């Protein structure tokens, strides 16, 4: 069929299949703003276009409908090198993070302002209601529209976007646009899907329909014979190598319990066969031709089921220890299944697979018996949390190709260096033959710390020699991606009558699902990032992680801390009620203070114990709680309005800034011949603004404009090793490496500048904009670089920095919530939510606020509406965004505020600490304690639903 239509003002004539999806059609025409986030259901809005004057989801259209249509995409906004008014406002406000659907947002807002000169909040909410954003938290979009409206009348108009910090510094703590925001909001090619070549093959995966089963028969011959099928990968022809999908520093503190393909299926969605074909359509057709027979086994779905004496064993294969094998290993292996498969454990992590235990650890300080004996009151409560999904706007995706004899991996990953190491081992190549390019990442939140499809894609390219694309559908995100662990946490508290704690005991049990990636470290963070909030002389913790047959779990932002914090905060609040003490008062009597030793952390480590006892070197909780109390009007009356009851709650929170003694970051900075700089950073910017942090740190040290610094990051050929984007490590680890590299280069510039000026080094200094200034005069960086590169020069000037540390930097914060609960219907209305956070010196204040809003809204979603649900046979019923319950703009609190409360930390660069992860740790307990304050019930399992409210009120 030949169709005629107008695209961004240009007439088009195309021969198409009438039923072709318009999103795919436009994307293939180079309209990279029209993206697919939700399998074409039209929920996410990433595919928004203007169709004959109306905002429409392109995925819901077929090509035949374009006949005589007028189409506008985000490519019509601005010019190739000039942002539109709305795009510029988005960049200036700092709303662009992962950026994946920001072109769609710019188009929708532009259309709104074309129709309504000064839209109300309700009109803004309505216009953006069809857009899904997992990272920005929505609140800053109101600022975007406020700024755009102001600039329509006055192009120089400004609004109050974010506070500034540190008057003694030039660029740190000041506004500066995110370095990659412009290209993302303009939809310039920067994601993996934008790099795919026309000759690329496509992978489609046949997945298990059973939660627990053995493959008894597998025949792929008919699929292999289908024209256009290039290769089929199964357990019969994949590498016989065991690994963990978890992207962690080697040796990994997780069981190596995964084979690329195995005979045993351990969850619905587990891998059976991968078809590599010339097109997606052929690959899907080939999947239907694969003949598989299963022996279906009884699934294990919960922690209690996994603990049962007669529970089915999820991992029944033999175990091999690299070091530290237990005395029981030989006996355990004698009862193992002999299928030619096994599991490897690098070092003891308390694993007992025959008991469905993936990992366990125990630790304590003080004398627990004495602590409880000294108590006037003792309480013990158990708290449960459900499985939650990261829902990155960009689904998991990988594109691999050969470049001569080298394997090139274009990846949407948080861990390019770990990915390279793991894939090289699996495909049998040396690391220098594997080149990982981390493209812009359309949302990660921990899920892209794991290697979930890259190794299959890489193996397919190695076997066939062809470029290969493997992209998850949204359904695969729910059944094959890693999600947040289910947890069951029991807390026992002993306290004096005044509420001061004498003993704290936490039993943290987690459900890791079918594989053990992060099975030690995520649950360990439950006590590690909650117990130190309330230092006590007598503390005991037990962590046990169980295998099951639910869909996989792994890293998710917060990394165990939200579960532990919910339990300890709720238990303390229940203790406060029993003692008739105000919740905020009992927090004040027990909370951590600046400079205090955190002794319990001496007993908790991520694979190894800390070399010293950490302390709260910087902690602004006193000021945070003072401000929060005033903002929420903590002690003011809470009037009842009919069936609606008002309540207020609070939770204090903490996080880390990297993993001391385990992780490392490196950086190199080169002075160019015109006096500008190129930074080669190993860090992985996944939308958090790390490249901007590195830019500003280099500019601050080198006294040059940030515009004179360009960052190349996350590319294993063009940067030095960095552990990656996890554990809130970016600012402290990657940032400190950049600071050290800049300081190293600064000394070289000063030395050669002093020589050129004929002055002692002690008499010269760097000065803005990019000069060495002495008593006799000054010389520019460009002149120094040029002299170095002449035939008689001293060579290119390069600075390097390598950062490791034994020291911790802890950000702190508090969440305050005000809810209204309808005691007749069970409805919960979140009226106010205030997130106050201490991230040391905020390097990028507007981006930091965006990180807080986004993380906090994700936590609100986990608390109020999100959960993965299964039937009795282990089939996940939640398989798309429409049924999952992640919040959109209409779900944010009416009064939603993020506040930066600075402190000065000695570990982070220029006093900075992490910011992006801590925001997810406190919403659940803040909301739950507010619900209790409103209507007197304790909800000990989240998320919170009207049914749970009414059940607790004994109304159903």
UniProtKB/Swiss-Prot annotation:
Pfam families: Ald_Xan_dh_C, Fer2_2, MoCoBD_1, MoCoBD_2. InterPro entries: 2Fe-2S-bd (IPR002888), 2Fe-2S-bd_dom_sf (IPR036884), Ald_Oxase/Xan_DH_a/b (IPR000674), Ald_Oxase/Xan_DH_a/b_sf (IPR036856), Ald_Oxase/xanthine_DH-like (IPR016208), AldOxase/xan_DH_MoCoBD1 (IPR008274), AldOxase/xan_DH_MoCoBD2 (IPR046867), AldOxase/xan_DH_Mopterin-bd_sf (IPR037165). Binds 2 [2Fe-2S] centers. Binds 1 Mo-molybdopterin (Mo-MPT) cofactor per subunit. Coiled coil: none annotated. One of its GO terms (biological process) is purine ribonucleoside salvage. The keyword Metal-binding applies. NCBIfam families: Se_sel_red_Mo (TIGR03313). Probably has no xanthine dehydrogenase activity; however deletion results in increased adenine sensitivity, suggesting that this protein contributes to the conversion of adenine to guanine nucleotides during purine salvage. Mo-molybdopterin binds at residues 414, 445, 727. Keywords: 2Fe-2S, Iron, Iron-sulfur, Metal-binding, Molybdenum, Oxidoreductase, Purine metabolism, Purine salvage. Belongs to the xanthine dehydrogenase family. Its cofactor is [2Fe-2S] cluster; Mo-molybdopterin. The lineage of its organism: Bacteria, Pseudomonadati, Pseudomonadota, Gammaproteobacteria, Enterobacterales. Its EC number is 1.-.-.-. This is Probable hypoxanthine oxidase XdhD. GO terms for molecular function: 2 iron, 2 sulfur cluster binding; iron ion binding; oxidoreductase activity.
């Amino acid at each position: 069929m030949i169709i005629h239509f107008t695209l961004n003002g240009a007439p088009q004539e195309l021969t198409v299949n009438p039923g072709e999806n318009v999103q795919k059609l436009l994307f293939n025409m180079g309209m990279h703003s029209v993206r697919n986030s939700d399998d074409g259901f039209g929920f996410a809005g990433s595919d928004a276009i203007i169709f004959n004057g109306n905002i429409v989801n392109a995925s819901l259209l077929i090509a035949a409908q374009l006949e005589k249509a007028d189409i506008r995409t985000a490519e019509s906004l601005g010019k190739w090198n000039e942002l539109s008014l709305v795009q510029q406002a988005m960049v200036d406000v700092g709303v662009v993070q992962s950026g994946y659907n920001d072109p769609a947002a710019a188009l929708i807002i532009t259309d709104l302002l074309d129709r309504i000169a000064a839209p109300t909040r309700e009109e803004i909410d309505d216009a953006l209601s069809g857009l899904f954003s997992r990272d920005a938290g929505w609140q800053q979009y109101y600022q975007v529209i406020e700024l755009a409206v102001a600039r329509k009348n006055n192009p120089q108009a400004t609004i109050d976007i974010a506070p500034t910090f540190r008057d003694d510094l030039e660029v740190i703590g000041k506004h500066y646009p995110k370095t990659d925001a412009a290209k993302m909001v303009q939809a310039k090619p920067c994601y993996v899907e934008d790099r795919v070549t026309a000759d690329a093959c496509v992978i489609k995966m046949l997945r298990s329909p059973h939660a627990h089963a053995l493959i008894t028969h597998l025949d792929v011959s008919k699929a292999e014979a289908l024209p256009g099928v290039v290769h089929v990968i199964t357990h019969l022809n994949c590498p016989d190598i065991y690994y963990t999908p978890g992207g962690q520093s080697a040796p990994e503190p997780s069981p190596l319990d995964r084979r690329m393909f195995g005979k045993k299926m351990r969850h619905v969605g587990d891998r059976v066969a991968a078809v590599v074909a010339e097109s997606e359509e052929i690959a899907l057709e080939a999947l239907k031709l694969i003949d598989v027979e299963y022996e279906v086994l009884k699934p294990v779905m919960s922690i209690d089921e996994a603990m049962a004496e007669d529970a089915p064993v999820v991992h029944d294969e033999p175990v091999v220890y690299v070091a530290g094998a237990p005395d029981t290993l030989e006996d355990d292996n004698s009862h193992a299944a002999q299928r030619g498969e096994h599991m490897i454990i690098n070092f003891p992590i308390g694993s007992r697979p025959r008991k469905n235990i993936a990992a366990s650890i125990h630790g304590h300080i003080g004398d627990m018996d004495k602590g409880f004996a000294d108590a006037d009151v003792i309480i013990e409560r158990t708290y449960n949390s459900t499985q939650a999904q990261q829902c990155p706007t960009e689904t998991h995706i990988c594109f691999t190709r050969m470049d001569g004899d080298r394997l090139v991996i274009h990846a949407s990953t948080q861990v390019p260096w770990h990915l390279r190491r793991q894939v090289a081992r699996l495909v049998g190549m040396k690391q220098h033959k594997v080149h990982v390019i981390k493209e812009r990442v359309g949302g990660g939140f921990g899920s892209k710390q794991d290697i979930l499809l890259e190794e299959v894609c890489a193996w397919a390219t190695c076997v066939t020699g062809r470029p290969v694309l493997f992209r998850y559908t949204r359904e695969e995100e729910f059944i094959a991606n890693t999600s947040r662990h289910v947890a069951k946490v029991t807390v026992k508290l002993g306290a004096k009558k005044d509420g001061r704690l004498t003993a704290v005991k936490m039993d943290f049990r987690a459900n890791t699902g079918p594989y053990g990636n992060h099975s030690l470290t995520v649950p360990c963070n439950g006590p590690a990032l909650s117990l130190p909030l309330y230092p006590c002389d007598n503390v005991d913790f037990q962590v046990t992680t169980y295998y099951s047959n639910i869909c996989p779990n792994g890293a998710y932002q917060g990394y165990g801390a939200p579960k532990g914090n919910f339990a300890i905060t709720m238990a303390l609040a229940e203790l406060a009620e029993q003692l008739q003490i105000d919740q905020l008062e009992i927090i004040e009597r027990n909370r951590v203070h600046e400079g205090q030793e955190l002794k319990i952390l001496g007993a908790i480590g991520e694979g190894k114990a800390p070399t010293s006892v950490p302390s709260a070197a910087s902690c602004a909780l006193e000021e945070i709680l003072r401000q929060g109390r005033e903002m929420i009007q903590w002690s003011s009356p809470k009037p009842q309005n009919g069936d609606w009851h008002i309540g207020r709650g609070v939770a204090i929170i903490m996080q880390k800034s990297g993993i001391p003694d385990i992780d490392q970051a490196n950086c190199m900075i080169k002075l160019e011949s015109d006096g500008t700089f190129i930074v080669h950073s190993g860090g992985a910017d996944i939308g958090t603004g790390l490249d901007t942090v590195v830019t500003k740190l280099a500019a601050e040290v080198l006294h040059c404009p940030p515009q004179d610094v360009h960052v190349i990051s996350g590319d294993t050929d063009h940067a030095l090793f960095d552990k990656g984007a996890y554990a809130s490590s970016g600012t402290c680890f990657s940032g400190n490496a950049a600071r050290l590299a800049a300081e190293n280069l600064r000394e070289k510039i000063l030395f050669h500048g002093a020589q050129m000026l004929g002055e002692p080094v002690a008499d010269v200094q760097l000065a803005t904009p990019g000069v060495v200034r002495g008593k006799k005069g000054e010389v520019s960086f460009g002149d120094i670089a040029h002299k170095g590169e002449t035939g008689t020069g001293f060579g290119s000037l390069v600075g390097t920095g390598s950062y490791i540390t034994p020291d911790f930097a802890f950000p702190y914060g508090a969440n305050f919530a005000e809810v209204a609960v309808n005691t007749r219907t069970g409805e919960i209305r979140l009226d106010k939510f205030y997130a106050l956070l201490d991230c040391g010196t905020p390097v990028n204040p507007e981006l930091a606020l965006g990180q807080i809003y986004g993380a906090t809204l994700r936590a609100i979603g986990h608390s109020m509406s999100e959960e993965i649900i299964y039937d009795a046979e282990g089939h996940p019923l939640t398989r798309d965004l429409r049924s999952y319950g992640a919040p959109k703009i209409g779900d944010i609190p009416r009064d939603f505020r993020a506040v930066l409360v600075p402190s000065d930390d000695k570990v982070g660069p220029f006093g900075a600490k992490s910011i992006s992860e801590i925001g997810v740790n406190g919403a659940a307990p803040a909301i739950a304690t507010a619900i209790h304050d409103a209507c007197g019930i304790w909800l000990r399992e989240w998320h919170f639903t009207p049914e749970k409210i009414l059940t607790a009120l004994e109304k159903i």
